Amino acid sequence: RVLSVKAAWINFFLVNKDIFLRTLCLIVVNFYFTSAGGKQGAMMLAVNTLLMTLFTIFSYVMDGFAYAGEALSGKYYGAGDKQGLHVTVRNLFQFGFLMAVVFMGIYMIGGTGFLHLLTDDNAVVEAARPYLPWACFIPVVGVTAFILDGVFIGLTDTKGMLFSTVMAMVLFFI
């Protein structure tokens, strides 16, 4: 019994190590992105901040899908219910992509309006306008990462999650 408890603790810390390193990769990319924007001047830093805020709003909603993925994937995987796991993952992707398309539409229709809610500086909003399409497509491009993050954590298969994040970080810097 002691060995099984010890093995469970070791697995717990290995999973958390992978999540910690994944989060560290995300922080490194965000730090670099902010630093690169700052080196281009105050205007570009302000533009990046506005556009990243749109991503942050979307990410709060998508974290709900990630949390659901963690809980439900873990539940069905732990119970050995492959059908329940399959249905859960399929539903997460269906509803996740639906929400991503909704956010993309909202950002495309009301993008500059949202930017004006975040700042009263018209020059910053105008400088952000050419980059707004990138922010509009982030939900559709990023939804898979949020859902898989939750599923990988729920399955305690965090090595694959860490590997994909490291590869994405490497590609970002290339």
What kind of feature is each model-predicted range?
Residues 53-54, 133, 166-173:
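Small-residue-enriched core segments of transmembrane alpha-helices in multipass membrane transport
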Residues 1, 126, 159, 169-174:
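Membrane-interface helix-loop junctions in multi-pass transport and translocation proteins
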Residues 27-57, 75-76, 113-122:
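Helix-terminus/linker motif at the lipid-water interface of multi-pass membrane proteins
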Residues 4-32, 37, 57, 61, ...:
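Hydrophobic faces of transmembrane alpha-helices in multi-pass small-molecule transporters and flippases
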Residues 25, 29, 33, 37, ...:
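Alpha-helical membrane-inserting segments
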Residues 1-16, 20, 73-138:
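Short alpha-helical transmembrane segments in multi-pass integral membrane proteins
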Residues 17, 29, 33, 69, ...:
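Hydrophobic/aromatic residues in alpha-helical transmembrane segments
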Residues 47-109, 143-156, 160-164:
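Small-residue-rich hydrophobic transmembrane alpha-helices
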